[in-house]
Amino acid sequence: MKVNRILIYSLLLAGITITSCKDDNPSIDDYWLNYEIEEVKVTQDIPVGVYLYNPQNALETNVDQWTRITEEQDVAAGKLGPNTKPWYDLPEALEAGKYHLAADTIGARAMQKIIEWCHYGRIDFMVLPGINENANDIYPLNIGRDTAFIDMVRGLNDTLPKVELNGVKFALMVNMNSMCSDLNNNKLVENVDPTRKTYPVIETIPDINNPGMDIVVTTRVDTLIKRSDRICSYFKRISDYFSDPNYYHTGGRPVVVIADANKLYTQDSYRMYTAIRDTVRKHTGKEMYLIAQQGAWTPPERFHYFYLSGKVDAVTMKNMCAVGGAQYERVILFDQFVNENYKYNKEVFWSRYNIDFIPSASPGYSQYVATENNSNYPWMPKTQERFWTMCNVAKMNLGTNPMVLIDSFNDWAFDSCIEPTDPSYGKGY
């Protein structure tokens, strides 16, 4: 009997020990990032926008960058370019395949091809390259030469081949840094020195030497303009394009993307953004839908005193494939990390600020074209599979006003583009 009791106790102890070991051992099944990004079926139309870049200057004049785009890929030798050629099939081009997109004849034909591709890909609108302020003039001359490119896209430049948008809309992106580059924590928009501007005033007055006749007189007026008024005037000029029938609206509101929104240092962000909205509303009768661009992998709370307190309508992330310098750990479970990042940002924006989230999707990222020897940034080679996965991550994190922004159509400097290439050359698609 005693032997039986010992045997029973031994078996019980062994069972407990085995069970305890099984419970204590970690399982990969329990790991919070152990999941796959599944294909997301959509049940409604999701508006899709795409960023249009204007990188032609570097690609036309920088032979090294063009070589790094077109040369054969050799990972062992550190040659990480896409081995492709941007492709327009334009007979006017001086060199086949050379990139060109500007307000001229070749640029207009290239723009028409881009629109055809956007239409084929069912892209709803293009976000045009960021518009800079012209600090030397006042409204309506305060955005300078950017008007030539915008008018070309709109098909309103009579000196160029007419561009037809064919149902593809456009939206504008403002470059906040062009007005706020000198601002910081100790130099706010409210206390920075006003800008001295001289502008012409044209008047018609009686000609004292010829009774009954008039003469036109131009007078130069010297004035001081507060920085906050400059910013409002800049948005007023941007809003002149809202009446274009091809300008993209959501819910009846014109969409404006704000690049470098974190450069607007102000004592009261809400008051500053309210002044901007009031200026545009008074000028156009429209309420803007403002989308602030946030840097990839940055925490939302960092921008509390900027556009979040300013109550923009939505926030979007820049290219998440740009994982940052030496951030190699983000590459290992990249898809899951992006998804968790989006989930967190979306929840914070909505629950704390009542601001919507607009996910972005990118096909890849590489520093190689822009800076050949910069190995500090992990290489995220552009692939169709990555782009599909990022689109599914975006669909998993749609906001209350569903929309997705693709970064980008043609940012060749960082090989993060979906623009078609010459299919007969290298790894063309």
State where each predicted segment sits.
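Sec-dependent N-terminal signal peptides
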Residues: 6-15
